[in-house]
């Protein structure tokens, strides 16, 4: 598996979570990008505050690293309530979820990351909690077992997932506010890089921030990670300030090219072009050709390449587009 080794992977790695927490915006007005989502949230939050009600349950979905956890924390801050965070795989038993729910206060936010990985038993407990603010608990065992209902204070469940399609229909239907996060444009990412540099006390000019943004694959988490590595380079090889030239030299040294591709991205594209004459090629053959698991190709490598128009996924297999050929200085055969 390659995820642990890639500087440009969108999933959390190493100290990302600790460092990202210091750079996270706290309020919607500080949040950059996702304009439609931000506009919707402003309306929903203000309406809930005017009615003095808990915000409706919210599902935030999209590729990793785009700010789902950050948005959940912003929602809690804007509503002026507490937030309790957990993740789907951690909630193994119904009692795990019950313990969290019974400790919530009125209006609090319960954030469940990777909510698509909830076990069926835990999910069943969640339904009445979301719909009626009630908790069904079984007391005793065998013939003497009986069910009791506990009333819960009104709360907001914020679920986050990279795979909205993996949620069961009953669970998905209980979220009143679905929000999809999209990849960021270079302008918004550049603003994020500049803000993060200020938090770090790092001198950076607009061209340097833009250069990092262009190679960040539309993902703030990657942008912040690259910024930290560029800072290391600037401090050791230059005077500590990040300019476009310093950013280019640092990112080239890190093997992250102008499109944000690393060695594995280029290896995948060149395999389709050179070994399979541009495609179409099936996923199993492609996985064997580059020595990777098919799941890694599908979940880690492909999404960004498809989104940027370098690969087409067809019923017959993967095809390298004309843009992929141009990236390597080639012309696609007719």
Curated annotation (Swiss-Prot):
Its EC number is 3.6.4.-. Residues 4-184 are annotated as: Large ATPase domain (RuvB-L). It holds the Pfam family AAA_lid_4. Its main location: cytoplasm. It is found in: Cytoplasm. GO terms for biological process: DNA recombination; DNA repair. One of its GO terms (molecular function) is ATP binding. Mg(2+) binds at residue 69. Residues 185-255 are annotated as: Small ATPAse domain (RuvB-S). Gene3D superfamilies: 1.10.8.60, P-loop containing nucleotide triphosphate hydrolases (3.40.50.300), Winged helix-like DNA-binding domain superfamily/Winged helix DNA-binding domain (1.10.10.10). The RuvA-RuvB-RuvC complex processes Holliday junction (HJ) DNA during genetic recombination and DNA repair, while the RuvA-RuvB complex plays an important role in the rescue of blocked DNA replication forks via replication fork reversal (RFR). RuvA specifically binds to HJ cruciform DNA, conferring on it an open structure. The RuvB hexamer acts as an ATP-dependent pump, pulling dsDNA into and through the RuvAB complex. RuvB forms 2 homohexamers on either side of HJ DNA bound by 1 or 2 RuvA tetramers; 4 subunits per hexamer contact DNA at a time. This is Holliday junction branch migration complex subunit RuvB. It comes from Shewanella oneidensis (strain ATCC 700550 / JCM 31522 / CIP 106686 / LMG 19005 / NCIMB 14063 / MR-1). The gene is ruvB.
């Amino acid at each position: 598996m390659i995820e642990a080794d890639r500087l440009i992977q969108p999933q959390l790695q190493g100290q990302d979570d600790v460092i990202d927490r210091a750079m996270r915006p706290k309020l919607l007005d500080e949040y950059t990008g996702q304009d439609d989502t931000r506009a919707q949230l402003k309306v929903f939050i203000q309406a809930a505050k005017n009615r003095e009600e808990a915000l409706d349950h919210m599902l935030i979905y999209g590729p990793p690293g785009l700010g789902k956890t950050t948005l959940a924390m912003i929602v809690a801050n804007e509503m002026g309530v507490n937030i309790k965070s957990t993740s789907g795989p951690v909630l193994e038993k119904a009692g795990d979820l019950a313990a969290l729910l019974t400790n919530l206060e009125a209006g609090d936010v319960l954030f469940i990351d990777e909510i698509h990985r909830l076990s069926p038993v835990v999910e069943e407990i969640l339904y009445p909690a979301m719909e009626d603010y009630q908790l069904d608990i079984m007391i005793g065992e065998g013939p003497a077992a009986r069910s009791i209902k506990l009333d819960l204070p009104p709360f907001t469940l914020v679920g986050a997932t990279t795979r909205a399609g993996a949620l069961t229909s009953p669970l998905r239907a209980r979220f009143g506010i679905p929000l999809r996060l999209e990849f960021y444009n270079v302008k918004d990412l550049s603003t994020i890089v500049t803000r993060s540099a200020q938090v770090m006390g790092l001198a950076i000019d607009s061209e340097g921030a833009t250069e990092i943004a262009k190679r960040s694959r539309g993902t703030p988490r990657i942008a912040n990670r690259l910024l930290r590595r560029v800072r290391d380079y600037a401090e050791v090889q230059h005077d500590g300030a990040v300019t476009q030239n310093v950013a280019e030299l640092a990112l080239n040294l890190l093997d992250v090219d102008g499109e944000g591709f690393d060695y594995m991205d280029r290896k995948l594209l060149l395999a389709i072009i050179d070994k399979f004459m541009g495609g179409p090629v099936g996923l199993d053959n492609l996985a064997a050709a580059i020595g990777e698991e098919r799941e890694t190709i599908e979940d880690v490598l492909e999404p960004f390449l498809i989104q940027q128009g370098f690969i087409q996924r067809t019923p017959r297999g993967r095809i390298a587009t004309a843009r992929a050929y141009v990236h390597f200085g080639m012309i696609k055969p007719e």
